[in-house]
């Protein structure tokens, strides 16, 4: 079943940049490209311009998501993922990237695909303060409370625990990076 696509107004800030496009039928995200050449050293972050700005219809927002290939092959992540583009924003879309590879620099060329733009309908809600929230099966469980990862397995004795101090300063992610560097 095919639906008519939502029309989103777009302006090229850089007259030569290709417009965001879906790589395959059925893709949720349209590829965004950078308009600059930039090299990122290990651990370095940068704000990359995309050369486009959009006018989204009221009731919609766009979300800037990472591209899995950049993460898997180069260690590039988005610092603010997903980045939110509100319907009223008219400035150039920019993407904050970071090179998480501990050893290799990453080079971006002009018009490299750097992120995906996903447009979604959003609801505005009314918040109503209450003294107590209704119960649920999950209750206050968070941060891995549902399991699904060996490091969160109750049998290992680490379920629900947050890393404490040590050489990574209490940052469990940093300890994973340190372990990877040692391989």
Swiss-Prot record:
It catalyses: dUTP + H2O = dUMP + diphosphate + H(+). Residues 138-183 are annotated as: Disordered. InterPro entries: dUTPase (IPR008181), dUTPase-like (IPR029054), dUTPase-like_sf (IPR036157), dUTPase_trimeric (IPR033704). Its cofactor is Mg(2+). Its EC number is 3.6.1.23. Pathway: Pyrimidine metabolism; dUMP biosynthesis; dUMP from dCTP (dUTP route): step 2/2. GO terms for molecular function: dUTP diphosphatase activity; magnesium ion binding. One of its GO terms (biological process) is dUTP catabolic process. Residues 141-150 have a biased composition (Gly residues). Substrate binds at residues 67-69, 80, 84-86, 94. Pfam families: dUTPase (PF00692). It is an enzyme of class 3 (hydrolase). Keywords: Hydrolase, Magnesium, Metal-binding, Nucleotide metabolism. Belongs to the dUTPase family. PANTHER family: DEOXYURIDINE 5'-TRIPHOSPHATE NUCLEOTIDOHYDROLASE. This enzyme is involved in nucleotide metabolism: it produces dUMP, the immediate precursor of thymidine nucleotides and it decreases the intracellular concentration of dUTP so that uracil cannot be incorporated into DNA. This is Deoxyuridine 5'-triphosphate nucleotidohydrolase.
